[in-house]
Swiss-Prot record:
The gene is TBCE. Belongs to the TBCE family. This is Tubulin-specific chaperone E. The lineage of its organism: Eukaryota, Metazoa, Chordata, Craniata, Vertebrata. Its main location: cytoplasm. Residues 27-71 form the CAP-Gly domain. It comes from Pongo abelii. The modification N6-acetyllysine is found at K463.
Length: 527
């Protein structure tokens, strides 16, 4: 840039040696002669002061070391969109091809051209582009009016993340020329958003908008969304968003909403987006949430909130109460949940226990933490849940005869699906209530008998094995003990509580506990 400065540089985004900043001041800084730019760095550790020099405040920074004064010729104000595309996507012709002469007719006159093939080839390359990635390419503006529409009219997907765009208006100047644009990513641009209304239909074809780390507020989200009538996916990660109002005439077509890492969001704010009619996926990772309630739905009922929500992500939060998952069972359409790295679920040794409890708590769930819930696993989880809280159920007034059930409100609130599980599998038997609870004592040692139905000469053994031991490890132990290859071993078990019923242990990756093996049961080993 030249040393001639004008006031319109204030607020523009710039790059200096790979670091991004915003211009806050342009002018003279005595006693040193010549023009200076005062910039506020995105990385405050890059700066030296707060915008003042020798007692005079030239501009203000959010951080005491966020500012610097820089000569204009050291600053990169960026490039326009079309130039950035050419720099990245147009293949340069060799010098010999550039010198080729060609006769073309313009009007009635023959005109001799040099490099005409090269120009046509470049235009052809640009017009065919449908997906463009210009991340960190110092794009600052749209460029010449109409140039984008003429040069690359077929673009459908654009990544403009981490560039030098300073305003939403500049984004619109680019996107408005791309009539087929469906996906737009402007993350990591410090954008100034409009304070007035935005004309609807500006980005009529847009389906996916990514605004992560742009500093946008919720009110600005709603204003920008007015220009995206067909929007289906909206990403707003890391913006310090506070949901201040309910979207009424906007976001009605959105199917996916990502609000991750917005620590100001709480449970009450989520009610404001709970009526979006088509919202199917909601990502709430790392927002600090610990509870969620649907007060419009009683025990065993479904809420009217989030009517279409199928997939919920609540990773990296503060969920520490099982009641959280009881509430999720009220969501009528929920089929998939991800809840990794929460206080209730982040202990590796309790991972299987937590998974089973969550499955038992949410009846319609099909996928948990991206792992499919097979019918066998659901049955196992629900039976263990029924058994684990059987004594509590009985003490709270539970009875095998439904007419004699007098369950306390406290128990029904803590275990809203328990009655349903009793209807599904039958009330827990007395012998079940006398055994140790499988979910609560996951790593208990089980005393088991080991028999060999096809080897009558083998002596019956008695072994203590941890309930968490996998079938694969049990086979390994028996292989060493019997001198028989692991691949030849077939395991099953029977319980004295159910004589004559033999259950195969067919999945090597599952634990003894998974198959409800208990103290006193008998392992049957065949080869």
């Amino acid at each position: 840039m030249s040393d001639t400065l004008t006031a319109d540089v204030i607020g523009q985004r710039v790059e200096v040696n790979g670091e991004h900043a915003t211009v806050r001041f342009a002018g003279v800084v005595p006693p040193v002669a010549g023009p200076w730019l005062g910039v506020e760095w995105d990385n405050p550790e890059r700066g030296k002061h707060d915008g003042s020099h020798e007692g005079t405040v030239y501009f203000q920074c959010r951080h005491p070391t966020g500012g610097s004064f820089i000569r204009p010729n050291k600053v990169n104000f960026g490039t326009d969109f079309l130039t950035a595309i050419k720099n990245r996507y147009v293949l340069e012709d060799g010098p010999e091809e550039d010198r080729k002469e060609q006769i073309v007719t313009i009007g009635n006159k023959p005109v001799e051209t040099i490099g005409f093939d090269s120009i046509m080839k470049q235009q052809s390359q640009l017009s065919k582009l449908q997906e463009v990635s210009l991340r960190n390419c110092a794009v600052s503006c749209a460029g010449e009016k109409g140039g984008v529409a003429e040069g690359c009219p077929n673009i459908r997907k654009v990544d403009l993340s981490k560039n030098l765009l300073s305003s939403w208006d500049e984004v619109i100047h680019i996107a408005d020329q791309l009539r087929h644009l469906e996906v737009l990513n402007v993350s990591e641009n410090k954008l100034k958003f409009p304070s007035g209304s935005v004309l609807t239909g500006t980005l009529s074809a847009l389906k996916v908008l990514v605004l992560n780390q742009t500093g946008i507020t919720w009110a600005e989200v709603l204003r920008c969304a007015m220009g995206c009538p067909g929007l289906e996916e909206l990403y707003l990660e890391s913006n310090n968003i506070f949901i201040s109002e309910r979207p009424t005439d906007v976001l009605q077509t959105v199917k996916l909403l990502d609000l991750s890492s917005n620590q100001l969001i709480d449970e009450n704010q989520l009610y404001l987006i709970a009526h979006l009619p088509r919202l199917e996926q909601l990502i709430l990772s790392d927002i600090g949430i610990s509870s969620l309630h649907f007060p419009d739905a009683g025990i065993g009922c479904k809420t009217s909130l989030f009517p279409s929500l199928k997939y919920l992500v609540v990773n990296d939060n503060q969920i520490s109460q099982w009641s959280f998952f009881n509430e999720l069972d009220k969501l009528p359409s929920l089929r998939a949940l991800s809840c990794l790295r929460n206080p209730l679920t982040k202990e590796d040794k309790e991972a299987e226990t937590a998974r089973l409890l969550i499955i038992a708590s949410i009846g319609q769930l099909k996928t948990l933490n991206k792992c499919e819930i097979l019918p066998e696993e659901r049955r196992r989880a629900e039976l263990d849940y029924r058994k684990a809280f059987g004594n509590e159920w009985k003490q709270a007034g539970g009875h095998k005869d439904p007419d004699k059930n007098r369950l306390s409100e406290e128990f029904l609130t803590a275990h809203p699906r328990y009655q349903f599980l009793c209807l599904k599998y039958g009330a827990p038997e007395e012998w079940e209530l006398k055994t140790q609870q499988p979910l609560m004592l996951k790593n208990q040692l089980l005393t088991l008998k080991i028999k060999y139905p096809h080897q009558l000469d083998q002596k019956v053994l008695e072994k203590q094995l941890p309930g968490s031991m996998t079938i694969q490890k049990v086979k390994g132990l028996l292989s060493r003990l019997l001198k028989v290859p692991v691949s030849d071993l077939l395991l099953s078990y029977e319980s004295p509580q159910k004589p004559g019923v033999e259950i195969e242990l067919e999945n090597d990756l599952k634990s003894l506990q998974f198959y409800s093996v208990e103290n006193g049961d008998c392992l049957l080993v065949r080869w």
